[in-house]
């Protein structure tokens, strides 16, 4: 009887943010995915909330960890040995883990895969967005631009530390030794602006979501569209309501349901009242399960984002419910939409074009089918696992080639 092949053990590394976010969910999902397929998946994690409990000396030591953390180096090496790790998969490292995790893995001759959730390696605030507009100054002019604008946590000192750490590890060519997962091809192209990263070391693998519980036939859906997200200027909520005012005045018959809270909530309420919009409703915070059900009952999800985004999970959740997505033509979000196939795109600065795009939903049954097909082919757990294993295999193969003794 043939013995089953043992799956490689993986160490997942993540620094949890103080406010829980999408990256935390991705790490949990990935761990579960690996374990479901027979992998041992160990965790090395830190939590940003630790900082609030630190004394002054510990905080200084923690800040220096952005350059190199002795604690990270020792603990990660120990974990690799104790858990017989074959590959280290890193998610977030700032501010407590730092680049020492890479050196710990490489010292143990274990390959490193880094998932790129944002633009941190190129932009200290990780967003390519500043003062109400997209900003790529640090890529085009240099990292000193971030110091000028206090781009990391609004602090000049912390921005200086972040910039110096990035410059140091660029000089050491730390980033050239890693394998990368970007969530979209758009993100891949941005990352490759860092010339020391070999293109063959960067693979595209999106995040995944579980399938929707039910698929409502498109013709049976409510005559409504839905916005799900933070009520924030960079999310395009003002542009959405300006477009909706045009849509209502032109005789459009659909309803708009807005789910979420945020700094623009008061403005939204005032705007709805002032413009006498009768077909738009603010619902406030809605749990994920209810939000997904609402998407499945709607004609479309609207995502009018004004920045590049990371990887909007709501798009994939909409696809899983066979719900078309109307999205601005920017960045990662725009790159996920195939116009006329899975949804519709509009110029990010045009409320008029968004209003006109809403009318394209009158005959969108085929778009609904295209969204579901795209989900089934690209964004299921099984599709994701196959993609992940191909990336892991490539990283381990290249690591093995580097570590083979020379025959000279």
Q: What is each model feature region?
A:
Residues 366-390:
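A short, well-ordered alpha-helix in the C-terminal region of glycosyltransferases
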């Amino acid at each position: 009887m043939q013995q089953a092949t043992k799956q490689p053990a993986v160490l997942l590394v993540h620094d949890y943010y103080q406010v829980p976010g999408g990256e935390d969910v991705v790490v949990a999902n990935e761990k579960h995915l690996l374990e479901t397929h027979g992998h041992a998946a160990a965790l090395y994690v830190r939590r940003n909330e630790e900082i609030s409990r630190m004394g002054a000396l510990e905080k200084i030591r923690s800040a220096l960890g952005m350059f190199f953390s002795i604690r990270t180096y020792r603990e990660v090496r120990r974990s690799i040995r104790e858990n017989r790790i074959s590959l280290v998969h890193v998610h977030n490292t700032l501010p407590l883990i730092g680049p020492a995790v890479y050196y710990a893995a490489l010292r143990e001759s274990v390959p490193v895969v880094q998932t790129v959730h944002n633009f941190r390696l190129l932009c200290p605030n990780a967003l390519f967005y500043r003062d109400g507009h997209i900003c790529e100054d640090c890529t085009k002019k240099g990292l000193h631009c971030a110091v000028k604008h206090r781009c990391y946590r609004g602090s000049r000192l912390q921005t200086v530390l972040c910039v110096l750490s990035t410059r140091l590890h660029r000089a050491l060519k730390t980033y050239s030794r890693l394998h990368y997962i970007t969530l979209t091809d758009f993100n891949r192209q941005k990352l490759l602006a860092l010339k020391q990263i070999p293109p063959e070391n960067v693979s595209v693998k999106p995040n995944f979501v579980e399938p929707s519980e039910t698929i409502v036939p498109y013709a049976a859906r409510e005559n409504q569209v839905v916005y799900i997200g933070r009520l924030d200027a960079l999310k395009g909520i003002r542009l959405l309501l300006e477009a909706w005012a045009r849509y209502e005045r032109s005789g459009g018959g659909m309803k708009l349901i807005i789910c979420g809270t945020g700094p623009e909530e008061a403005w939204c309420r005032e705007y709805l009242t002032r413009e006498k919009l009768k077909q738009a409703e603010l619902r406030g915070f809605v749990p994920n399960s209810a939000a997904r059900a609402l998407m499945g009952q709607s004609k479309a999800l609207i995502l009018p984002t004004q920045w590049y985004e990371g990887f909007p999970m709501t798009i994939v959740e909409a696809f899983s419910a066979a719900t078309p997505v109307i999205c601005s033509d920017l960045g990662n979000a725009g790159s996920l939409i195939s116009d006329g196939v899975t949804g519709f795109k509009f110029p990010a600065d045009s409320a008029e074009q968004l209003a006109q795009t809403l009318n394209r939903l009158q005959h969108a049954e085929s778009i609904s089918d295209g969204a579901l097909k795209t989900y089934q082919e690209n964004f299921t757990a099984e599709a994701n696992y196959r993609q992940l294993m191909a990336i892991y295999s490539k990283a381990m193969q290249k690591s093995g080639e580097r570590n083979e003794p020379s025959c000279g």
